[in-house]
Amino acid sequence: MAKKEVKKIVLAYSGGLDTSIILKWLKNEYGCEVVTFSADLGQGDELEPVREKAFKTGADKVYIDDLREEFVRDFVFPMFRANAIYEGSYLLGTSIARPLIAKRQMEIAQIEGCDAVSHGATGKGNDQVRFELAYYHFNPGITVVAPWREWKLNSRQALINYAKRNDIPIPITKKRPWSSDRNLLHISFEGGILEDTWLEPPENMFVLTKPPEKAPNKPQYVEIEFEKGNAVAVDGVRMSPAELLAHLNTIGGEHGIGRVDLLENRSVGMKSRGVYETPGGTILREAHMAVEQITMDREVMHLRDSLIPRYAEMIYNGYWFSPEREMMQCMIDESQKTVNGVARLKLYKGHCRTVGRKSESDSLFNLDFATFEKDQVYNQADAEGFIKLNSLRLRIRSLMLANKNK
């Protein structure tokens, strides 16, 4: 669709430098109505000033929606039922937020009669893929305006100059030479000084967590209860999904839990450094795996575990709404029906360790079979036949090699 044909755009708007400039640029270049949408995913910032800034910068209408409960309940928790983790370290805090933002953006586009959507993701990053795959899931014919792939504002200074020319009220500072993105699950840092892969991230960068060496000298124990793979209570107190994750963030942050420094493989093909704080998510994943250990069948667990890398890649690469992810989610959720129980964790100076787990309804741990003491239910002599049968292929191969070498 040509610029002149676009009549109304809904923009995913944060109020930061990039999206404020994009808002003005859309008004100048497309000459159409622009509706902004800002999602409250637990950034910790007051979003009402964003409304005023959007109107001052040219927005015709502003949406600000509180999506915290939906974010944790319908996106974070399903992902955590799978124990998803990307490249062994990243708990996908940014990746899982984009599908929800795009979903609500497309709902607003339909409500407002918009014929185009826009976002502030750069042409080098993962987010452009995540947003646009979701857009096309909801409306295959939607027009996507991606300014970073159109304009010539290809440097930070060019953006600042554009902002000054257009009287966009944006504070410019060099005190924090990196970019960040925050929601209830995590906060991410990238760019700027972090592009030096040898440089240790400065301590003043971190927001959610204490440095482990300055965390309390006394460990804290926390008990997390699960029902069908979802956390429902902490230390016996039931909470909503968003309340629970926020509470774990506070506890984990106090003990320096959940810092990760990762050089990851982006979906567009390049490597990029990301530094993350995920205190509550780190605790939640450890607790979930502990309850699974006592409630989940071995072969079910091993099959599910073999699929975790693929499932995590789907989320990282923007395929949350794909049929393969939805199919896999059905299988994962089936495996979680027995994941009911409580995990007990010990938090101490950056470490989160399971020290106990129990399940009153679904425990597969049977002391009569597992004990190292004398028992009446397991005949240890039976192990001989089991071993001989399982070693048959190894013995045959050994005999074959011996005959071959004669």
Swiss-Prot record:
Q: What is its EC number?
A: 6.3.4.5
UniProt-listed GO biological process terms: argininosuccinate metabolic process; L-arginine biosynthetic process; urea cycle
Q: Assembly state and interactors?
A: Homotetramer.
Please list the reactions this protein catalyses. L-citrulline + L-aspartate + ATP = 2-(N(omega)-L-arginino)succinate + AMP + diphosphate + H(+)
* ATP-binding as UniProt keyword: yes
Subcellular compartments: Cytoplasm
- Pathway, according to UniProt? Amino-acid biosynthesis; L-arginine biosynthesis; L-arginine from L-ornithine and carbamoyl phosphate: step 2/3
Q: Kindly provide the name given to this protein in its UniProt entry.
A: Argininosuccinate synthase
Which GO terms label this protein's molecular function in UniProt? Answer: argininosuccinate synthase activity; ATP binding
**Could you read off the lineage of the organism from its UniProt record?**
Bacteria, Pseudomonadati, Thermodesulfobacteriota, Desulfuromonadia, Geobacterales
**Signal peptide feature range:** none
Q: Into which EC class is this enzyme placed? A: ligase
Q: Which family does it belong to?
A: Belongs to the argininosuccinate synthase family. Type 1 subfamily.
Recorded GO CC terms: cytoplasm
- What are the protein's UniProt keywords? Amino-acid biosynthesis, Arginine biosynthesis, ATP-binding, Cytoplasm, Ligase, Nucleotide-binding
Q: Which residues bind L-citrulline?
A: 90, 95, 126, 130, 179, 188, 264, 276
State the InterPro entries in the record: Arginosuc_syn_C, Arginosuc_syn_N, Arginosuc_synth, Arginosuc_synth_CS, Arginosuc_synth_type_1_subfam, AS_cat/multimer_dom_body, Rossmann-like_a/b/a_fold
Pfam families hit by this protein: Arginosuc_syn_C, Arginosuc_synth
Protein's organism: Geobacter sp. (strain M21)
